[in-house]
Amino acid sequence: MSTVGTPQAITVRYSIDAKRSTFTVRAFATGMLSAFAHNPTIAIPDFQGEVSLNPDAVEQSSLRMVIHAASLTVTDDISEKDRREINRKMHEEVLETDSFPDIEYECSRVSGSKIADGQYLVALNGDLTLHAVTRIQSVSARARLNGDMLRATGDFPVRLSDYEIRPITAAGGTIKLKDELKLSFDISARKQE
């Protein structure tokens, strides 16, 4: 059987543009005094990565992303003193950023379907390395191609205990963070030349 004249699917590489993207973590308080605590929103401003996308064969696509853990910062409307203290605890006691500076996600197991011209629903099953522990992390996203730009949106849960991380506690343990965090993203990536 001849393949002459058959169009070949082309994989296109995109570089993630952190400045045009948003990536956040929501943590939720629990415990006897949790009604008096707040549920912090944490911005992830410093990350980079690359997407390889084959629009005609999504399963041949891949993603690699590196987050600089020390860049995570609380964005809530709280006092500067509280912000510094929460950020310090997050970096020193939870993420231990001096020992584990990067959070990495690498995925080459992608499935999905085209839902409209240039729009896809995708499911990624990749390796998330956090706090020197690697686990399979599933992420569902809606991806859209627009000229030289790729945009992906979605959210997914991460359990701290899966990565051997103890949640922060306060007020003698009567307030602590729940084990499960919610990560939300609106990632833009530009086609590489």
Each predicted region: which residue ranges?
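Low-complexity, acidic/polar, glycine-enriched regions of mature
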Residues: M1-E193
